[in-house]
Amino acid sequence: MAMDQVNALCEQLVKAVTVMMDPNSTQRYRLEALKFCEEFKEKCPICVPCGLRLAEKTQVAIVRHFGLQILEHVVKFRWNGMSRLEKVYLKNSVMELIANGTLNILEEENHIKDALSRIVVEMIKREWPQHWPDMLIELDTLSKQGETQTELVMFILLRLAEDVVTFQTLPPQRRRDIQQTLTQNMERIFSFLLNTLQENVNKYQQVKTDTSQESKAQANCRVGVAALNTLAGYIDWVSMSHITAENCKLLEILCLLLNEQELQLGAAECLLIAVSRKGKLEDRKPLMVLFGDVAMHYILSAAQTADGGGLVEKHYVFLKRLCQVLCALGNQLCALLGADSDVETPSNFGKYLESFLAFTTHPSQFLRSSTQMTWGALFRHEILSRDPLLLAIIPKYLRASMTNLVKMGFPSKTDSPSCEYSRFDFDSDEDFNAFFNSSRAQQGEVMRLACRLDPKTSFQMAGEWLKYQLSTFLDAGSVNSCSAVGTGEGSLCSVFSPSFVQWEAMTLFLESVITQMFRTLNREEIPVNDGIELLQMVLNFDTKDPLILSCVLTNVSALFPFVTYRPEFLPQVFSKLFSSVTFETVEESKAPRTRAVRNVRRHACSSIIKMCRDYPQLVLPNFDMLYNHVKQLLSNELLLTQMEKCALMEALVLISNQFKNYERQKVFLEELMAPVASIWLSQDMHRVLSDVDAFIAYVGTDQKSCDPGLEDPCGLNRARMSFCVYSILGVVKRTCWPTDLEEAKAGGFVVGYTSSGNPIFRNPCTEQILKLLDNLLALIRTHNTLYAPEMLAKMAEPFTKALDMLDAEKSAILGLPQPLLELNDSPVFKTVLERMQRFFSTLYENCFHILGKAGPSMQQDFYTVEDLATQLLSSAFVNLNNIPDYRLRPMLRVFVKPLVLFCPPEHYEALVSPILGPLFTYLHMRLSQKWQVINQRSLLCGEDEAADENPESQEMLEEQLVRMLTREVMDLITVCCVSKKGADHSSAPPADGDDEEMMATEVTPSAMAELTDLGKCLMKHEDVCTALLITAFNSLAWKDTLSCQRTTSQLCWPLLKQVLSGTLLADAVTWLFTSVLKGLQMHGQHDGCMASLVHLAFQIYEALRPRYLEIRAVMEQIPEIQKDSLDQFDCKLLNPSLQKVADKRRKDQFKRLIAGCIGKPLGEQFRKEVHIKNLPSLFKKTKPMLETEVLDNDGGGLATIFEP
């Protein structure tokens, strides 16, 4: 090989690399240089000498790195074709580079070290231990040469562990060989790592204060850091005996290093991994040494030092790790301490709790939040929750919670010490807000556990806080959502106001405490007098601030259980709530109501409903008083919104359920619904509901847009229509018969019994609702017709978009963050269009809610309505072609699903089949077309036609809606057709330390899923059966992973099993099997989907191959299929006497057969495949003891190509 050839090539390569890395190079030159370099790596026969020449330390760093890349490429892609001598030469050359071809540890670039270690690891993966038995000895020898070499050895050992154990980037047999050899040599490796760490730490500590030896100290420190990083890669999976060897020497060293500033972070990482270990409890017991005096001292002093000098990022990151260490330590204690365990509560448990509490009270929201799960584990623990030390710290924990519940610390603000830390942890106020909300929900859970352990102290603290807030002057702060609205109390609060954040936190605290107290204490232990005193104070508190009033209402609801002991306070409670139902910030204001005011009024209505639902017996004696009050409010048409009116009616209906007398309740409902019936059944209304043109004129969508501030001429019409629909829904939803059968009989609710002996009930609202049903169906028919293009053309600007989605709905579907500061002073609807959109959206959904509730509410009285199927088909299912996805989806969910699920079996043929047959056929056709459009769109979107970058783009919204509709349809089919007989245990995780190959096909669908009676009924009808099968199997190739996963695992096989006994057309069998393979092509990159689809394909092939040869023809078309392997598989399948292989083995074989059609992730589709050959196996499963013999026998007779 001529050296000048190498020199010439190297010169060209240096130029090419320089061009590629030069920012001033043109795109054309850069591409040419890249092409030259890639072709060189692929084709040049003298890659190794060129790579070695370029990697010499005399070259510049980018050239050296490219030289090392060439060598790595040779090992990865050419190794199998190299001779023994070539391999030995390359190995020796690389080892020489490490020994003498690298710069000083402090000068050498990290990417050079990384590239060198990668080459060695790639060789190890191909040759160790069989052909390179002395690899560890060679690394040991290298490490003795100096700090640079020692650090490189650390890199090699770490990367080897990552590739073999963590990422598992090599074939199973090689992985097993290497991992088992590593395990056998672990004592040696571990002692090497520990000695390296100790030696370098000792040297570093000796010279770190000597300025003349600064570089020496830094070199030792760098090796120490590398040793800690490498240990972190092993601690996670090696046997616990190595971690706890020599009286927990490793843990001791790590604790000592916590106070060594340059090494403390790496030490904390190692400690965290060690303390977080799972596995046998017996093996983990030695970890309790960390509760000892010495370890505790080092951990706590390190925390104090790190937190002492203010906020420094490096120290703060370390503090986070230490916090995690304490969390993991607490979780280990909870796991190890049990009734049948000999582990005792540590003597330093009190000190641990105090130090842990220090993290809970730290200004950093992240640190506070990190401690919550461990507090939860401690408070739940059977033994620790009774420990006096833990009980003593609960008041302190609750005091900390009181502070932590207050929403402060936004990164953009400076009103709290938390803000500074938040600027490190969160990119924006929105990020902080999302984190804080989820963290506060978790804290609420833990707080409730603490309250359960000490309910009286908790209640006392909550009471004090409530009294304090009631007596404190309101501070709206400087950041206001409200422009000066004169209320006599200064400006109103915003969600950021100092008063509001305190009220909000106190309200959450009080709610949690009282709920737990009533659950925990006996009736006679409840502090009734104190509770009533607090309730009176809240009832007497008066405020005109809507946000504060909302908190006050929550406190009234929270304290309401005390009224069960003193019912005489009930009228006062209702008086407070009713005054809030009509709340206004400015009396007799003609201005539009603001969001804050609307929220208060809704809150008051909800509270009334909640009390009537949860305490109907308590409220019943006051029924007449309530009824009169509601009638008075309803008499003024403009005083309440339609939703508020109906909420109050719902509350009355809930109490009327306590009459437990059919006739009395029926008379009451008749009276309550009389105003609704008179509007709804009038001739004018009938004309409006039945005629689309009349409807458009009535609701005002043909009017030119008027000023939002002026009177809306059709507003009252829409209000009346909404009132009727809301009222019908409220009555249908809330009216029910007594749950107790004897009470139901006595009250006249039972009208007979079914053939199986179940009682048939009648609902007091049936008569009222059924007479309103015709007009309701007319409204639904008219509403559906509105979407026809010719009807939309009749609407005036801006109401042409009246049927569109609201912007808030679009944002929710696209997952866009909501604005942080809801503009509480802004009107509920910003524009007349927005008001109209909300009207149509609510009206549409409520109509279908009524139909959905009618079945479960009225039962046989609804299902026996004459020609019900025809009536529904001619109203709810009219003009579906023009109904958008966002309207069709709620219709399926709130109407079709309950209609079908609650239908008695005797009405399946007359009602369900005539509706679902055409519906499923239509839905399949619609979804297929939509997915076809989406697929074509993604194919057309090439480089020239870039996709719209706008996250709110219409295409993204449409695609997401199609996805959501698909899920709704598949869910409807599954609910109708499939019942799950048993829980699916297949997804249980493998046991710790299980070294068996876990095939992804282990995630199998539940074999217990069977067809329901309705499913069987539907499958009897050929048109419905075809629609169901085609929809289910076609959906496997639609671009929605979640839908595919559910359909594959729950629906496909039960449906197919139903038709297997009959005769299937060969074309149908081919299509079904091909559909599953297409699904694999689309979703094979997702492990869960791939496992379910492989299992389904396997089931179909096994069931149908013996009867249909055509299915074999499909298999033969799979790319790269091994025909001989397929023949063997078929032979075993078709010959029952041979078929004794375990199901898992057969499935694995089948998966290998169809591997050619399993889709890959985009990142792997164009990656060049690396082939690592298996070496003769060292380890035979039958005789595990031979492993050591093989190693000790100088390679056991195997050819060793790498001689030392």
UniProtKB/Swiss-Prot annotation:
Its main location: nucleus. It comes from the Eukaryota. SUPFAM superfamilies: ARM repeat. InterPro entries: ARM-like (IPR011989), ARM-type_fold (IPR016024), Exportin-1/Importin-b-like (IPR013598), Exportin-5_C (IPR045478), Importin-beta_N (IPR001494), XPO1/5 (IPR045065). Residues 533-640 are annotated as: Necessary for interaction with ILF3. One of its GO terms (cellular component) is RNA nuclear export complex. The modification Phosphoserine is found at S826. The keyword Protein transport applies. Residues 2-108 are annotated as: Necessary for interaction with Ran. The modification N-acetylalanine is found at A2. The modification N6-acetyllysine is found at K396. It holds the Pfam family IBN_N. Residues 641-642 are annotated as: Pre-miRNA binding. Expressed in heart, brain, placenta, lung, skeletal muscle, kidney and pancreas. It is found in: Nucleus; Cytoplasm. One of its GO terms (biological process) is pre-miRNA export from nucleus. Component of a nuclear export receptor complex composed of XPO5, RAN, dsRNA-binding proteins and dsRNA. Found in a nuclear export complex with XPO5, RAN, EEF1A1, and aminoacylated tRNA. Found in a nuclear export complex with XPO5, RAN, ILF3 and dsRNA. Found in a nuclear export complex with XPO5, RAN and pre-miRNA. Found in a nuclear export complex with XPO5, RAN, ILF3 and minihelix VA1 dsRNA. Found in a nuclear export complex with XPO5, RAN, ILF3, ZNF346 and dsRNA. Interacts with EEF1A1, ILF3, NUP153, NUP214 and ZNF346. Interacts with RAN and cargo proteins in a GTP-dependent manner. Belongs to the exportin family. This is Exportin-5. It comes from Homo sapiens (Human).
